[in-house]
């Protein structure tokens, strides 16, 4: 994977973000997602690569495009595996709320964990706490470790948690330590990545979210040197989601076994979820967020704000791109 390919991967998320942003605030989350999917696949098709979707919009019979196993690209060139979420935070986009973005992770063939469409317990933390916090420790223990590693008082730590009923006890425990809780309604990828940067005001992500997004978060944090661990959740009593109504713990365990997962309780480290030699994360804002701005439509141009993180050169590049419309008369700087 070279720098030219990485630039094209950036353009993939930019085009997905622009397509989805045209429906920001319209209350049409499914349409916004579909627009992003189509734009992402179209741009991928123009890249000289043998691409494969390992995490996408669902199984082949569930999604018309970017389904798991779909081949993308020209069919020649380097082999690249992708984990994609063309519109992360569809509800956020539909309601013009902060934090929606187009994201993906990429690596050479075989470099990304093919996460099942399950839930995942996650722990993300800054590089200073890597290998010191642990997903098997209590929230209280991890918060005290974070405080010591970062040199920040417990009362000044901000812990991001998805605002879900299943996290009632977790939130209560965090607050009992004196740390602050920042609940989010959707989209935990950006919060996880924010843990990898100092000065974002986000010190840790805890709790249960979607497993596929966990792989994308792991790819970014691995490249940043941050901490990420994930553990699959298969018990409906733990997940506490309407999506799993009627499912059983035993049935989910059987599904995991069919997928080749022999140890359903395994704790995955970042370098297991994103194990490739060359791992790239790319994200482009649909709406304004913690790390970058959303798409801005001007009379003569469209502006995108994006982030690319790569293990190729251990870099994180924030990119502000002006997409000039044909016949443009003037281009706004800001």
Swiss-Prot record:
Substrate binds at residues 88-90, 119, 164-166, 186-188. Mn(2+) 1 binds at residues 33, 57. Pathway: Carbohydrate biosynthesis; Calvin cycle. Its cofactor is Mn(2+). The keyword Hydrolase applies. Its EC number is 3.1.3.11, 3.1.3.37. Keywords: Calvin cycle, Carbohydrate metabolism, Hydrolase, Manganese, Metal-binding. Mn(2+) 2 binds at residues 85, 88, 213. GO terms for cellular component: cytosol. CDD domains: FBPase_glpX. It holds the Pfam family FBPase_glpX. GO terms for biological process: fructose 1,6-bisphosphate metabolic process; gluconeogenesis; glycerol metabolic process; reductive pentose-phosphate cycle. One of its GO terms (molecular function) is metal ion binding. It catalyses: beta-D-fructose 1,6-bisphosphate + H2O = beta-D-fructose 6-phosphate + phosphate; D-sedoheptulose 1,7-bisphosphate + H2O = D-sedoheptulose 7-phosphate + phosphate. InterPro entries: FBPase_class-2/SBPase. The keyword Transferase does not apply. Homotetramer. Belongs to the FBPase class 2 family. Catalyzes the hydrolysis of fructose 1,6-bisphosphate (Fru 1,6-P2) and sedoheptulose 1,7-bisphosphate (Sed 1,7-P2) to fructose 6-phosphate and sedoheptulose 7-phosphate, respectively. This is D-fructose 1,6-bisphosphatase class 2/sedoheptulose 1,7-bisphosphatase. It comes from Synechococcus sp. (strain RCC307).
């Amino acid at each position: 994977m070279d720098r030219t390919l990485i630039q094209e991967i950036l353009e993939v998320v930019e085009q997905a973000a622009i397509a989805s942003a045209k429906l920001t605030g319209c209350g049409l989350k499914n349409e916004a997602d579909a627009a992003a999917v189509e734009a992402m696949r179209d741009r991928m098709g123009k890249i000289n690569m043998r691409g494969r979707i390992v995490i996408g919009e669902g199984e082949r019979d569930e999604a018309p495009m970017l389904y798991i196993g779909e081949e993308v690209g020209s069919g020649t060139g380097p082999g690249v595996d992708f984990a994609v979420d063309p519109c992360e935070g569809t509800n956020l986009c539909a309601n013009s709320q902060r934090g929606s973005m187009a994201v993906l992770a990429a690596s050479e063939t075989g470099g990304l964990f093919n996460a099942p469409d399950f839930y995942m317990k996650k722990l993300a933390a800054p590089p200073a706490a890597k290998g010191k916090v642990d997903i098997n420790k209590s929230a209280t223990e991890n918060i005290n470790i974070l405080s010591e590693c970062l040199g920040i008082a417990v009362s000044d730590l901000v812990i991001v948690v998805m605002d879900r009923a299943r996290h009632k006890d977790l939130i209560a425990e965090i607050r009992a330590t004196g740390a602050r809780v920042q609940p989010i309604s959707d989209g935990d990828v950006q919060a996880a990545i924010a843990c990898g940067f100092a000065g974002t005001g986000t010190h840790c992500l805890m709790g249960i979210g979607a497993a596929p997004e966990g792989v994308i978060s792991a790819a970014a944090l691995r490249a940043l040197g941050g901490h990420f661990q994930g553990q699959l959740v298969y018990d409906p009593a733990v997940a506490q989601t309407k999506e799993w109504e009627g499912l059983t713990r035993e049935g989910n365990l059987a599904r995991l076994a069919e997928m080749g997962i022999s140890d359903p309780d395994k704790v995955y480290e970042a370098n297991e979820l994103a194990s490739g030699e060359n791992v790239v994360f790319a994200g482009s804002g649909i709406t304004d967020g913690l790390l970058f701005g959303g798409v801005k439509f001007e009379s003569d141009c469209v502006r995108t704000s994006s982030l690319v993180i790569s293990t190729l050169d251990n870099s994180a590049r924030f990119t502000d791109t002006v997409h000039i419309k044909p016949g443009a008369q003037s281009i706004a700087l800001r």
